[in-house]
Regions:
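Acidic/polar, glycine-enriched structural segments that form the non-catalytic walls/loops
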Residues: 1-141, 160, 170-178
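Aromatic-rich carbohydrate-recognition surfaces in CAZymes
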Residues: 139-224
Length: 224
């Protein structure tokens, strides 16, 4: 069977699941505090049920068999607190408190919330998906049309390091982009709208012909 979910290892307070789908394999490590029971309701559907009113756990996804988790929830909360404190103290901010328009407070709230949502959903090692992690649009893949819209603002908010994370993808995909350009009769590199982590062409009726994503890389590079 090509789709499997297995209990890779388990003890009194932790377990590791091995997930396999075709040639893709990843591991889910969970460490919890307190008593709990892990049960399988059906294929690929496991439930961890606490046996007390107070329960906490940490979870990690890895592409290789992991070492045992050593951290706990207190450490996770502390690391999160330190990260977001640094995030807000480093970047730009807005203050509409002097605005007389009655919509100013709501607009400020949305600007601040958007900074947070874009940081958690669009600042990874690959160009972001159109709907981030909230929804599963565009076949679950990123497409280069939206890289500018979803990542350029990081540099303008003085958080260029978050944009830089996904810029390396262009260098990794360059050999494939050069081959695509040659195939289509162009010089240089051809960044396709519909692509994937490897840089190859993803299925699309019009993706092969669209060019509006071509200058994004140049524009973003100037921001550094």
């Amino acid at each position: 069977e090509k789709h499997k979910t297995e209990i890779f290892s388990q003890d009194d307070h932790s377990f590791v699941l091995k997930r396999t789908l075709d040639t893709t394999v990843y591991y889910v490590s969970v460490k919890y505090e307190g008593k709990a029971v892990l049960s399988e309701k059906e294929k690929h559907y496991l439930v961890l049920t606490p046996e007390s009113d107070k329960f906490s756990f940490v979870c990690e996804f890895t592409d290789k068999a992991p070492a045992k988790l050593n951290n706990n929830t207190n450490e996770a909360f502390e690391a999160s607190s330190q990260y977001w404190t640094a995030f807000w103290e480093k970047g730009g901010a807005v203050d509409f408190s002097k605005c007389t328009d009655e919509r100013a407070k709501e607009l400020e709230r949305r600007v601040i919330l958007s900074q947070y949502l874009m940081a958690i959903q669009s600042a990874g090692m690959y160009p972001p998906q159109e709907t981030g992690l909230t929804y599963n649009s565009w076949f679950g893949k990123f497409h280069l049309e939206m890289h500018w819209w979803h990542a350029v603002h990081f540099a303008l908010w003085n958080r260029a390091d978050l944009l830089e994370r996904s810029m390396d993808w262009y260098a990794q995909a360059y050999p494939v982009a050069k081959q695509i350009a040659e195939r289509q009769g162009f010089k240089g590199a051809r960044w396709l709208k519909m692509t994937d982590p490897s840089g190859t062409e993803a299925p699309s009726k019009v993706g092969s012909f669209l060019i509006w994503q071509q200058p994004h890389f140049i524009y973003m590079a100037v921001l550094f």
